[in-house]
Amino acid sequence: MAAPRATDEIDIAARATISYSSEDPAHPIENLLDERSGPGGTRWTSARADTIERIVVEFDQPQTISRLDYEVEETMRDRTQEVRAEVSDDGGRAYRQILVQEYNFSPHGATFQREEQRVNLHRVTHLRLTIVPNKNGSGTASLTALRLFA
């Protein structure tokens, strides 16, 4: 289901370049931005199991960010995925951590998580997400949606 775009939402596709360490061709990085979020939405998935992955959003112009939203869904297996968010205001030379969050998934319990993190960030040139697919075993990194707000 497409989430309506808020007036203060940053159009990541129009204002940034996204790089990533890997993607499953059936679940490409573009799925993060396609507005089909929520349970059952499209998703980005790593092409490599048991590998820590990175997604870097490089903005065309420095951005002010007041909120970071992302979603994760796992319906098939038990796993604990960790997401770390870091920002740079110097063109990607140095980053500072703004968020570390773990999500515990179980097919018979929690299968969907949405994070809405309020922040007060200025002149952001890069946002880097590091995804640990499973802190306690095997798994593949994935994210369902990524939204940023000015």
Q: In which residue ranges do the predicted regions lie?
A:
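Disordered, acidic Ser/Thr/Pro-rich linker "stalks" and the adjacent N-terminal cap
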Residues: 1-60, 73-77, 147
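Trp- and acidic/polar-enriched beta-sheet ligand-binding modules for extracellular glycan
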Residues: 10, 21-25, 48-52, 74-150
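Short loop/turn positions at the edges of beta-strands in beta-sheet-rich folds
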Residues: 59-62, 121-123
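Short glycine/proline-enriched coil/turn segments at helix->beta-strand junctions
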Residues: 61-64, 100
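Short beta-strand/loop motifs in extracellular/secreted proteins, especially
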Residues: 63-66, 81-83
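Short edge beta-strand/loop segments characteristic of extracellular beta-sandwich folds
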Residues: 69-71
